Each structure stands twice: as structure tokens, then as C-alpha cells.
Regions:
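Basic/polar N-terminal segments that are highly enriched at the extreme N-terminus
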Residues: 1-9
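Short Pro/Gly-enriched beta-strand edge/turn motifs at strand-loop
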Residues: 15-21, 122-126, 147-149
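Metallo-beta-lactamase
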Residues: 42-45, 50-51, 136, 143, ...
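Short Gly/Pro-enriched turn/cap motifs at secondary-structure boundaries
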Residues: 25-26, 127, 133-135, 155-157
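Active-site HxH/HxHxD metal-binding segment of metal-dependent hydrolases
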Residues: 50-145
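Short glycine/proline-enriched coil/turn segments at helix->beta-strand junctions
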Residues: 39-40, 63-66, 82-88, 169-171, ...
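Active-site micro-motifs of SAM-dependent methyltransferase domains
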Residues: 22, 77, 95-96, 162, ...
Length: 215
């Protein structure tokens, strides 16, 4: 059953299994989902949401240890909470958007972020898109080792040039970001490559997936 975390009621936490949690922002029209994975040696947060609440504190409370953050892609609604994670990882093809060349002007992002359900006191006018250099740049094909859990980094371009999915073969979990989600898959953004998008979806469809966990 979904539970609001006591440390930040903006987020809803749902247990996927005993060591995997969805951290969602259902109060915003985007409804982004991030995922906290606990291994016996390390914990991983896939995406960091809008940057409205303190997702770093929520993740640390679920993990009980420092958390590694990784991105599926560098869109504002997936990287907003990265200020709580000085060292994070993303694909190298997203680097320009992370270090000063984000394509949307601040006013356009704030217009998309605006929602009547934002927390009281949230400074919408002061909101800025996260900018920062990753501590690690993916190429695709890397393995993330959490001890008793391993994930593979799959480069799945299309939604954005450096979009990646995270594949956990032992569990059959595929964390898909904005490659696959419920509803119509939008492929008409300026940064979207429809042909690459289709190839990436077909690649994902060929995996022995037991559960898709979208962003």
C-alpha cells in the first residue's frame, strides 16, 4: 500500500519488494517515479525527480546509508533532486544538457513545473534547472555492483541522445525512464530521434523482463 514518508510528504513511497522502492511525485501532473535499490554493500537511486521535495533525505531514510544517484536522462523532471547528490552518473551524450546547454529557458521549465498542488511555500520563481558535471559518464555496457545485486547500463537513445535503462537480470526488472511508460510514447520532441527510439524499444522488448519500472 502506498505510504507518504514522514520526512517529506511530497513523495509517495511504494515497496516493489523488500529492497526496492518506488519514490513518486503523484501530486504533480508529470507524476515522475524514481527508484531506490538496496544491496548488501551499496544503495542506488535511479533518477531524482522534479527537485520540489528533498528526495536525498527520503532515499537515505530508506537506505540507512549513503546513496549513489544515477540518471536515465538529463531532462529537468528526472534530475531536479541532484543537488543532494554531489557525485552522480549519467550517459556522456547528456553532458551538454548537464553543463550549461539545457535547451529550455528557465521560464519555460517553471511553466511546466507549475501546479496548484505544489507545497505551500515552494519558491517557483527561484526554481533553477540543475546543472553539474557527473562523477561518472556511462557509455553503455557497464555493470553497477551493489553487492548482492547487479544492474547493467543499457544505452537506449531516442527519447534523448543519452537515455539509458537499467537492467537487473536476476530480478527481471527493467528501469526504463522515459523509454517505456504507461500511455502513448511521445517521440515528437526536438531532442527525440523516432528511429532510435523504435530501435531502443525493440531492444528492451527482446529482454526477458518480468517487470517494467518506468520513470
Amino acid at each position: 500500500m502506498p505510504q507518504h514518508t514522514p520526512s517529506d510528504r511530497w513523495f509517495t513511497v511504494e515497496a516493489i519488494d523488500a529492497d526496492t522502492y518506488a519514490i513518486s511525485e503523484y501530486a504533480h501532473w508529470e507524476e515522475p517515479h524514481c527508484y531506490l535499490l538496496n544491496g548488501d554493500r551499496a544503495s542506488l537511486l535511479i533518477d531524482t525527480g522534479l527537485g520540489v521535495g528533498q528526495i536525498a533525505a527520503v532515499a537515505a531514510g530508506l537506505a540507512g546509508r549513503p546513496v549513489i544517484a544515477v540518471l536515465t536522462h538529463a531532462h529537468w523532471d528526472h534530475m531536479g533532486g541532484l543537488r543532494g547528490f554531489p557525485a552522480f552518473a549519467a550517459h556522456r551524450a547528456e553532458l551538454d544538457w548537464l553543463t550549461g546547454q539545457f535547451p529550455l529557458p528557465p521560464a519555460a521549465v517553471r511553466a511546466q513545473l507549475n501546479d496548484p498542488r505544489l507545497p505551500a511555500g515552494f519558491d517557483l520563481d527561484g526554481y533553477r534547472v540543475f546543472q553539474g558535471r557527473p562523477a561518472r559518464l556511462w557509455r553503455g555496457g557497464e555493470t553497477i555492483d551493489l553487492g548482492d545485486r547487479q544492474l547493467q547500463v543499457l544505452h537506449t537513445p531516442g527519447h534523448s541522445p543519452g537515455h539509458v535503462c537499467y537492467w537487473e537480470p536476476a530480478a527481471g526488472y527493467l528501469f526504463t525512464g522515459d523509454l517505456i511508460y504507461l500511455g502513448e510514447l511521445a517521440a515528437d520532441f526536438p531532442s527525440t530521434d523516432p528511429q532510435a527510439f523504435l530501435r531502443s524499444v525493440r531492444r528492451a522488448a527482446a529482454l526477458p523482463v518480468r517487470r517494467i519500472l518506468p520513470g
